[in-house]
């Protein structure tokens, strides 16, 4: 099994927009606005941060989400001797200190300036490698065009768990994957894509943060919401959660993205039926309750902490069963999901070393 759209990015975008009629209409309107705005203002822009005399690596962020920061900024700790440029959507100074800064560089060592996509070649003549999450978002796509036009390597870092609905990899790219199985899944038989297995920085850090200790499980089962997702129909996510919660007297924890009117109405209806809704802001990695979900990463994060965790769906499609097997997630009624094995070397360090090796061989 592999991707539904292993090569065609436009077909993937079209599928994504069609998943929800309201989302599709809204997306069409937003795209028209962006197109008009783009014609007036030029093209994709952002803030360019540079350190070192001549940047050799361009790291591209389309957001500052935790998964994006873990995948793309953590390697900075191990790239002290390499000139680096960061292309970000907005001010990133808060993320260029502390855990993402090395001992050699700190926030004050970065120069910042606004930049448009058509200025990349002029301002970054020494770049030999682009690192991103893929070419399916604006900056990642613009950086891919920049790389293709100049014959520059384009590397994609896996930042989340893979489903068949994931976007295709760019033609001629190099994938840095969580596992050999994920590399094979995302490449989907393509011969133009090279792969390296590096592990998940997010899960690696979760293991390090436990300090070898486990958390005592307390309280009712939390069902982790995913009604915002496009991988399954909203009704399928809702049916899985509702049937489980009514049967096992659990608590529903909405995903942070479940803020639309339909999601809020669903939460309110469930409360009338007697289903408890967790509206707290306590981070999931601090919650002691056992967890269940359809396929949330939170299942693996809970397992790492020693918290009992399972997956559940009353009628899972074949791809979901394959997903559960690939990530070692156990179904409700089986033993709790075991903590995933992690590499001996920090993934961010492995990524940095691969970059250094590539630049030295260039």
Task: Locate predicted features.
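Catalytic donor nucleotide-activated moiety binding site of glycosyltransferases and closely related
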Residues: 90-101, 137, 246-278, 325
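Active-site and donor-binding regions of nucleotide-sugar-utilizing enzymes
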Residues: 2-10, 42-52, 58-201
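Donor nucleotide-activated moiety binding/catalytic core segment of transferases
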Residues: 258-305, 309-310, 315-316
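Short hydrophobic beta-strand segments
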Residues: 1-35, 46-66, 86, 130-132, ...
């Amino acid at each position: 099994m592999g991707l539904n759209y292993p090569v065609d990015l436009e077909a993937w975008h079209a599928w994504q927009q069609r998943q929800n009629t309201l989302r599709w209409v809204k997306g069409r309107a937003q795209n028209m606005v962006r197109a008009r705005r783009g014609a007036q203002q030029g093209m994709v822009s952002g803030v360019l941060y540079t350190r070192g005399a001549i940047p050799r690596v361009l790291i591209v962020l389309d957001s500052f989400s935790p998964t994006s920061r873990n995948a793309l900024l953590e390697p900075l700790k191990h790239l002290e001797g390499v000139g680096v440029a960061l292309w970000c959507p907005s001010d990133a100074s808060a993320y260029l200190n502390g855990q993402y800064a090395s001992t050699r560089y700190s926030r004050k060592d970065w120069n910042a300036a606004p930049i448009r996509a058509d200025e990349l070649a002029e301002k970054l003549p020494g770049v030999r490698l682009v690192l991103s999450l893929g070419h399916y978002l604006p900056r990642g796509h613009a950086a891919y065009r920049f790389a293709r036009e100049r014959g520059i390597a384009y590397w994609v870092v896996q930042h989340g768990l893979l489903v068949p609905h994931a976007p295709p990899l760019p033609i001629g790219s190099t994938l840095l994957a969580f596992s050999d199985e994920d590399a094979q899944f995302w490449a989907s038989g393509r011969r133009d894509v090279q792969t390296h297995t590096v592990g998940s920085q997010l899960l690696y850090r979760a293991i390090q943060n436990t300090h070898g200790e486990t958390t005592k499980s307390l309280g009712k089962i939390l069902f982790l919401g995913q009604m915002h997702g496009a991988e399954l129909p909203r009704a399928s996510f809702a049916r899985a959660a509702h049937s489980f919660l009514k049967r096992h007297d659990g608590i529903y924890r909405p995903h942070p993205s479940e803020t639309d009117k339909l999601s809020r109405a669903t939460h309110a209806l469930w409360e009338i039926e007697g289903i408890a809704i967790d509206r707290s802001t306590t981070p999931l990695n601090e919650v002691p309750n056992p967890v269940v979900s359809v396929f949330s990463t939170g299942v693996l994060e809970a397992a790492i902490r020693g918290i009992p965790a399972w997956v559940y769906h009353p009628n899972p499609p074949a791809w979901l069963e394959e997903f559960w097997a690939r990530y070692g997630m156990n179904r409700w009624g089986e033993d709790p999901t075991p903590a995933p094995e992690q590499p001996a070397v920090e993934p961010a360090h492995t990524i940095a070393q691969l970059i250094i090796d590539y630049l030295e061989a260039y």
